[in-house]
Regions:
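Surface-exposed loops/turns
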Residues: 131-132, 155
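Short, acidic Ser/Thr/Gly-rich low-complexity loop/linker segments typical of extracellular
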Residues: 109-123
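A short tyrosine-centered beta-strand micro-motif
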Residues: 133-140
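Short, surface-exposed beta-strand/beta-hairpin micro-motifs centered on an aromatic residue
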Residues: 123-129
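Bacterial N-terminal signal peptides
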Residues: 8-19
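Primarily secretory-pathway and cell-envelope proteins
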Residues: 25-105, 144-178
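Positively charged n-region of N-terminal signal peptides that target proteins for export
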Residues: 1-4
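Beta-strand-rich interaction surfaces with strong enrichment in secreted/lumenal proteins
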Residues: 116, 126, 149-152
Length: 178
């Protein structure tokens, strides 16, 4: 049994929850994620010794493009996710993971522009189900933008692209009352 404490910044407040999960290394249990039939969320099925626990991650849509954010806590980092063509991983300074990154994708061939607000990016991973093509990506954290040019994606294949900032410029967490 693994006790995982998940912490997230939600609406300006730090939220902490506890997930009790089977130890995947001991029992071979796997956390599986799938898109719900109504396409409103990605649901994680987490095996525990008292049954399957479910967690939902919001699934957003911009036209025909779907995307969701994940990677907070051990459960989300070890899950098996649906095949979205692009996975962006955000890091900064000495922090292995950052969130709140605003992302703009451009397809130079036809001028398509998609903008994903930082508020939708609550974890260090951003999964985007893009149509086949070559894209330019701009990722902005704390006013500093990183560029990735000529990234080619194909449906059915996952491209993982790491985006790193030299310094951590993510917003400060709210002070906690004593």
């Amino acid at each position: 049994m693994v006790k995982t404490y998940l912490m997230a910044l939600v609406g300006g407040c730090m939220v902490m929850s506890l997930a009790l999960t089977a130890d995947a290394s001991a029992g071979g249990s796997t956390v599986v994620a799938h898109v719900l039939s109504d396409e409103e969320a990605v649901e994680l099925e987490i095996p525990t010794d008292i049954g399957v626990q479910k967690e939902r991650l919001p699934l957003y849509r911009l036209g025909a493009v779907r995307y969701f954010s994940a990677g907070i806590g051990q459960v989300e980092r070890t899950a098996s996710y649906p095949l979205f063509s692009l996975k962006l991983v955000f890091t900064a300074g000495g922090k292995p993971f950052v969130s709140g990154v605003a992302v703009t994708l451009r397809q130079p061939k036809d001028g398509t522009v998609l903008t994903i607000p930082g508020e939708h990016n609550t974890g260090p991973w951003l999964f985007i189900d893009l149509p086949d093509g070559t894209y330019q990506i701009s990722a902005t954290l704390g006013g500093v933008t990183q560029q990735v040019n000529n990234l080619t994606v194909r449906r059915g294949h996952v491209i993982t692209q790491h985006v790193r900032w030299a310094e951590d410029r993510s917003p400060a967490l709210p002070a906690q009352a004593e």
